[in-house]
Amino acid sequence: MSRVVRAPRGTELHCKNWQIEAPYRMIMNNLDPEVAEDPANLIVYGGAGKAARNWEAFDKILESLENLEEDETLLVQSGKPVGIFKTHEMAPRVLISNAMLVPKWANWETFWDLEAKGLTMYGQMTAGSWIYIGSQGIVEGTFETFAALAKKHFDGSLKGKFVLSAGLGGMGGAQPLAITMLDGACLIVEVDRNRIKRRLETKYLDVMAEDLDEALGMVMKAKEEGRALSVGLVGNAADVHPELVRRGIIPDVVTDQTSAHDPLNGYVPNGMTLDEAIALRKSNPEEYIKRAKKAMAEHVLAMLEMQKRGAIVFDYGNNIRRMAYDEGVKDAFNIPSYVPEYIRDLFCEGKGPFRWVALSGDPEDIYKTDQKVLELFPDDPILNRWIRLARERVKFQGLPARICWLGYGQRAEFGLAINEMVRKGELKAPIVIGRDHHDTGSVASPYRETEAMKDGSDAIADWPILNALLNTASGATWVSVHHGGGVGIGYSIHAGVVVCADGTKETDLRIERVLTGDPGLGIVRHADAGYEIAIKTAKEKGIKMPMLK
């Protein structure tokens, strides 16, 4: 019988204060069956992104937090608690490093070897940093991306447009909801029937289809009628996409959210059933990887052909282009990345994914904070539309949570307002405030967030390290540095931060420092690279940059 983990609710503490209770509840929330993709194996999302290295390490993390003093800091090395040291009350209670490798050895083969020896763990982005909130965590970012695409190409709406993608895991599961929120009709291909069923249960997906003809019939009818509809098709994109090309059916928009970043534990080869693929993964991993990469090449070739025939095609940051390129698809990078196409201008303004979680477990706490963010920022139309749609259509997974994109100044203002609500007793318990690592100044990822930087600094990884150091110095509740999230081992370095709004005056200082410096560094990073929007923002906001002219 598999173990079931669920975060405590209510106001009873299991640790010495809320600054320690917060990571205690959030690591458990990451493994809640409502939240995690494969909780029995400690896998939260993203192929093999884990919350802890093994169950023994998980239990020791909880035990360490239960006994942690208010002026101590727990160190976690790739999902394993390795030390507790006396620091001070304003220091982080937990510091995490996941999957870090010396650059010469930063590749999947070395990582898998070390993982098999029990020495490391893949933390993805928010899996190993204990701030994953289910598919909602990416829905809003996906909504922002498709909204920017719709604004650029289709007068702000996806109405009457056919969007094709694949992957309905923890990340990809956000796609159908985001697309239908913008009135589009979409077909999402997924090999795992259970993942499709899960998205139906959470109301992120409208319909499941077993047959391509059936799926196309529904999607094309919805497109013609200008009706929002999402269809999940049981199938493999490496088979389905080439078949669409053969039939001459070219969608308006094409992207991909399969776990292509991980050719062993993520992407599933075509030409076999899912059960056969899982068996091959265990019996002959080298053959599995070979077949997976071949399938990715076929997948990308079909996307390129659709692009040539007029589809708007973009890469959604899963490194599928690189995998295909390595298999001989030399024009794979003709497909542009979503960040320079649709998101970078937002990063230049210090905007990014801001999330908060009700430690009480009471949805009313989130609804009250929804109202507060609308009161604070009434002139932001995308934010207001998102909050309204999220309240109507996003089902909570695990502890109730919300996400929205906020910029420099907005984050600190809202964070302080939340802390004031806790202090006044308007909320039943403290609120955890965090973000995805996919943010303005916290990641170096040349095939995703930092692709095609203006000054050529795509691979410069000082920025996420500076981000983690700054957030530690600013007094965050916990800080993490990870390797390989989103695009796989060897391709990214990134940092996460969480602060617990416990209602105290001391936490006002934490919040103001963390939620100002964190997005502020993103503006600095982009201004340093020569982006005019970031330079203008830095000057307007009074951000000190010694070498800014």
UniProtKB/Swiss-Prot annotation:
Source organism superkingdom: Bacteria
Q: Give the reactions, separated by semicolons, that this protein catalyses.
A: 4-imidazolone-5-propanoate = trans-urocanate + H2O
How the cofactor binds, per note? Binds 1 NAD(+) per subunit.
Asked if the record carries the keyword Cytoplasm, the reply is: yes
Provide the GO MF annotations for this entry: urocanate hydratase activity
Report the pathway entry. Answer: Amino-acid degradation; L-histidine degradation into L-glutamate; N-formimidoyl-L-glutamate from L-histidine: step 2/3
Write down the required cofactor(s).
Answer: NAD(+)
Q: Print the keywords alphabetically.
A: Cytoplasm, Histidine metabolism, Lyase, NAD
Provide GO CC annotations from the record. cytoplasm
Enzyme active site: 404
Localization per record: Cytoplasm
Q: What is its EC number?
A: 4.2.1.49
Binding-site residues, NAD(+):
46-47, 124, 170-172, 190, 195, 236-237, 257-261, 267-268, 316, 486
For biological process, the GO terms are: L-histidine catabolic process to glutamate and formamide; L-histidine catabolic process to glutamate and formate
Primary role? Catalyzes the conversion of urocanate to 4-imidazolone-5-propionate.
The entry assigns this protein to a family as follows: Belongs to the urocanase family.
Q: PANTHER family, per this entry?
A: UROCANATE HYDRATASE
What is the official name of this protein in its record?
A: Urocanate hydratase
Task: Write down the species.
Answer: Caldanaerobacter subterraneus subsp. tengcongensis (strain DSM 15242 / JCM 11007 / NBRC 100824 / MB4) (Thermoanaerobacter tengcongensis)
The gene from which this protein is expressed is hutU
